[in-house]
Structure formats: C-alpha cells, structure tokens
Swiss-Prot record:
<dbReference type="InterPro" id="IPR035570">
    <property type="entry name" value="UPF0234_N"/>
</dbReference>
<comment type="function">
    <text>Nucleotide-binding protein.</text>
</comment>
<protein>
    <recommendedName>
        <fullName>Nucleotide-binding protein ESA_02876</fullName>
    </recommendedName>
</protein>
<keyword id="KW-0547">Nucleotide-binding</keyword>
<dbReference type="InterPro" id="IPR007551">
    <property type="entry name" value="DUF520"/>
</dbReference>
<dbReference type="GO" id="GO:0000166">
    <property type="term" value="F:nucleotide binding"/>
</dbReference>
<dbReference type="Pfam" id="PF04461">
    <property type="entry name" value="DUF520"/>
</dbReference>
<dbReference type="GO" id="GO:0005829">
    <property type="term" value="C:cytosol"/>
</dbReference>
<dbReference type="InterPro" id="IPR036183">
    <property type="entry name" value="YajQ-like_sf"/>
</dbReference>
<dbReference type="InterPro" id="IPR035571">
    <property type="entry name" value="UPF0234-like_C"/>
</dbReference>
<comment type="similarity">
    <text>Belongs to the YajQ family.</text>
</comment>
Amino acid sequence: MPSFDIVSEVDMREVQNAVENATRELETRFDFRNVTASFELNEKNQTIKVTSESDFQVNQLLDILRAKLLKRGIEGSSIEVPEEFDHSGKTWSVEAKLKQGIDSAMAKKIVKLIKDSKLKVQAQIQGEQVRVTGKARDDLQQTIALVRGGNLGQPFQFNNFRD
C-alpha cells in the first residue's frame, strides 16, 4: 500500500543563512544607521532573538527576517512570535521560536481534516509525524493537496513516499 509521512521540519542551515542575510541587510539600511539592533540565532533552543531600541524597529526587523526566511524557502508561519515584546533599559527584544515537529493537537487536526474529507486513506499519528496510507496513489495526492490547502497555521513537508 502506498504511504507517505506528513512532517513539519525547518532546515537550520537555511535559517542560519537567512539570519546572516538579515544581519547584512541591517548593516546597510539607512534607517538603522547608528541604532543598536541585532539578530541572534540560538540553534540549541531553536529561537531567534531580535533586539532593537524601539518596539517599532523590532517589528521592522521581524519583517526583514520573515522576508529573508521566505527567500530561503522557509514559510513565515514556521516562526512563532509572541504578542508582547520584552523591554529592559533602552532596548526592546523578542524571542521568536521556530516550529519543529507536529504537536499532538495539530496532529489531531490533520487526522480530523483527512477523515472529514471522506478520502479512502488512513491517517495515523506517529510521534511528531502523521503517516497516511491508502490503496491508490491519486488518493494520497489529493490528501497532500487537502493538507496544503487546509490553512492549519504551520508549514508541512511530505516525505518518505512509498509505493
């Protein structure tokens, strides 16, 4: 029986490249001249710390970061930014988390979406991924299109396709 896995992974090398590109753009932008602003990638915690002198500039830095991530093939929804920024002294900062893996609540949403579609496939939650099996390859391709168009708030990759 053909099957594939639905996963949510972010390539940390691409994230590192995007952060370096954003830092390079930050150094050349006129509106950030003589301003203390930075991007810091923590690969261990999978977070990106954005720091600047005002909350408005932090929002601008987040826009730069999202644009650079998108250019590197990482969707903007793969980072989770808190609503409130931290303020200490004369700097504002925010720590954006990278979404890795599919948590159980999201996996249940995916399985429910697939079951509600009445496609002839079975979906199973296996840790941080969802395995989808079916008799026909066309059903699996329809399932991929369904999950991509599902607007679930997280980017998904489809791998381990077996016939």
